[in-house]
Amino acid sequence: MQKNNHNNIMVFFRNGKRKKEPRCGGMEICMSEVIVVTSGKGGVGKTTTSANVGTGLAKLNKKVVLIDTDIGLRNLDVVMGLENRIVYNLVDVVEGNCRYKQALIKDKRYPNLYLLPSAQTRDKTSVSPEQMKALIDELRQEFDYIILDCPAGIEQGFKNAIAGADRALVVTTPEVSAIRDADRIIGLLEANDLKRSDLIVNRIRMDMVKKGDMMSIDDVVDILSINLIGAVPDDENIVISTNNGEPLVGNDTLAGQAYMNICKRIMGEDIPLLDLSEKSGFWNKLKSIFSSK
């Protein structure tokens, strides 16, 4: 990004800087851990991130439950390809209509992965933060990781999703509106005593960064001043995998590798960031060679 534009954006967000949190010192985090995936703004890839992080941790032999907290607008079941197996949902559990084990959907592809779907015909006030925390405390006894897919916005759904969470993954894209919302969310997380927040920069395009048409990863980290846990390139394979209900984490795509590296960092491994500029240049070069034939 050109220097003047970058300086203007920095002033736009804040005059003072938030203190950066140190990276995890390579030590594995205490189990069980509850992670809320949030953003503030819709459409930045939060649900896709939740699906891939949950699936990746399950692939790494951790027992994982994904919880869709977006009551009334559930999507996580579709992204996971489990929409046809729903019998009970989150609201049924908190209202006592069923036990949580009856509502859990076991992913047949990954023996350690479960989904607790949201209700589609209720509103966000159907669940309170106290009820959500009580459910999470119960789930802690059985699962290594509990991943909460947070709805967009900062109202009741957000309050429910952060109740009982140990840390947050804040997902943003390199756009001013998305970063502005992420900045607000980080402040709200801190105000609610959720001090540990890690940043995922999604849909990064190095060709646009080089031309000054998109903020770089460093620009985004500089503005938000929280620990960067991963960057995911803009990849058409993400759209394909989402439409197919098959998370791509761990496959041979750049995005799949990026998501798996995020999962390993969550577990405390010291994994370097993918060199997206080098990889992108390599793949673009290959494409140009074959397209010219």
Regions found by a protein language model. Name each.
Residues 39, 68, 117-120, 150, ...:
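Flexible glycine-/small-residue-rich
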Residues 34-98:
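Walker A/P-loop NTP-binding active-site region of P-loop NTPases
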Residues 69-141, 242-244, 249:
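P-loop/Walker-type NTP enzyme "switch/lid" segment
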